[in-house]
């Protein structure tokens, strides 16, 4: 018989069916993120309604998110953003460092509207909740390489291993490089448009 796949979300900090949650939430799976060519948090606006995200002009790996028109475009640590970012259950207190790379992703949930009851005062616009994969407690390697124009190379590696009877270790690495159209005559080479190295260890 035909059936409808149940979508589980953790918008209220517990696993529930998306049909039972009284919150406007967009839940994205790994497959949806990959099909949408979502590379980092900022790209999620392609798949979620009433959401805009853009780079912070003053760096810091920051991103300004706007949900239903509510946003805060600053990295100042003494001011809280109007849209909160939660990474693996940990709340990011400012916009700095929130434009994460999403190559090691388990799920994404975008909650629209005030979420202060569960997430605190600086979530009047909503919350972007990002969950990365956890150790599988089994030996395994996932490796992927993409080569594109402009000398773009994107190498991704995830390694899992068991530790003892109940523990696990996960190591994830990514190396992304891409040339710019600008040529540096002093160094006789093209400037790098993107040059990213990311690593994480979870146990």
Could you say what each language-model-derived stretch is?
Residues 82, 94, 103-112, 117-199:
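Outer-membrane beta-barrel translocator/receptor signature
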Residues 1-2, 199:
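Intrinsic disorder/low-complexity segments
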Residues 2-138:
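Acidic, small-polar-rich N-terminal luminal/periplasmic segments of exported/outer-membrane proteins
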């Amino acid at each position: 018989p035909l059936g409808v796949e149940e979508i589980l979300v953790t918008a209220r900090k517990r696993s529930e069916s998306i049909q039972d949650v009284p919150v406007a939430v967009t839940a994205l799976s790994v497959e949806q993120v990959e099909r949408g060519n979502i590379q980092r948090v900022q790209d999620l606006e392609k798949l979620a309604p009433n959401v805009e995200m853009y780079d912070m002009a003053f760096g810091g790996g920051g991103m300004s998110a706007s949900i239903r028109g509510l946003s805060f475009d600053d990295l100042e640590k003494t001011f809280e953003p109007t849209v909160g970012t939660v990474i693996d259950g940990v709340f990011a207190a400012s916009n700095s460092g929130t434009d994460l790379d999403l190559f090691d992703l388990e799920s994404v949930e975008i909650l629209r509207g005030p979420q202060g009851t569960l997430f605190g005062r600086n979530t009047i616009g909503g919350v972007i909740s990002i969950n990365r994969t956890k150790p599988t407690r089994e030996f395994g390697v996932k490796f992927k390489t993409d080569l594109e124009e402009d000398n773009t190379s994107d190498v991704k590696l995830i390694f899992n291993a068991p530790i003892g009877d109940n523990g696990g270790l996960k190591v994830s690495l990514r190396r992304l490089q891409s040339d710019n159209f600008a040529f540096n005559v002093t160094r006789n080479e093209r400037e790098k448009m993107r040059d990213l190295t990311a690593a994480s260890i979870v146990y």
